[in-house]
């Protein structure tokens, strides 16, 4: 009877331990930013954003150059103009400076909107693919191991290769 009780306790421990092991969650990791940056769509979007940025920079540079030329002209002509004309010209210069500042601010907002518009679907595609691969491989949790996002140690399964394969990159 004592052996039976010992055997029963041993069986209970083995079954309990095995169910505990099976109950543990499977965890994987992936550097999501690295994945997104490897996607061709990301590179194309960044290129388009950079092109738009250069266009805005060139326009602003031309506006500033035009303002500088106008200011030089007004300064050269100032001695031969009345105080009233010089004051009017000074207001014109200030209005142009404000206009350039407003244009610069609008250009920055435009760039930010364009970046969100272009990158949001790329990040969503990566997220969907990560979920698909994780689910197919039976992972309940996927941690983002991108530097600075809080994962200290990432020795579990790295899904990068599988997700890249799923995305065709």
Model features per residue range: what roles?
Residues 1-8:
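Bacterial N-terminal signal peptides that target proteins for export
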Residues 9, 13-15:
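Hydrophobic alpha-helical targeting segments used for export or membrane insertion
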Residues 18-23:
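Sec/Tat signal peptide C-region and signal peptidase I cleavage site
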Residues 24-169:
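Amphipathic, charged alpha-helical segments and their helix-to-coil junctions
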């Amino acid at each position: 009877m004592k052996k039976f009780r010992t055997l029963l306790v041993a069986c209970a421990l083995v079954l309990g331990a095995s169910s505990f092991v099976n109950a543990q969650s499977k965890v994987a990791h992936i550097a999501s930013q690295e994945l997104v940056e490897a996607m061709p769509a990301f590179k194309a979007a960044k290129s388009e954003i950079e092109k738009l940025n250069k266009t805005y920079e060139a326009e602003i540079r031309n506006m500033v150059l035009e303002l500088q030329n106008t200011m030089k002209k007004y300064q050269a002509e100032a001695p031969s103009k009345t105080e009233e004309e010089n004051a009017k010209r000074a207001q014109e210069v200030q209005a142009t400076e404000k206009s350039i500042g407003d244009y610069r601010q609008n250009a920055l907002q435009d760039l930010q909107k364009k970046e969100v518009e272009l990158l949001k679907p790329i990040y969503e595609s990566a997220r969907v693919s990560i979920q698909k691969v994780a689910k197919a491989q039976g992972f309940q949790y996927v941690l983002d191991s991108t530097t600075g996002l809080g994962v200290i140690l990432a020795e579990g399964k790295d899904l990068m290769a599988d997700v890249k394969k799923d995305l065709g990159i």
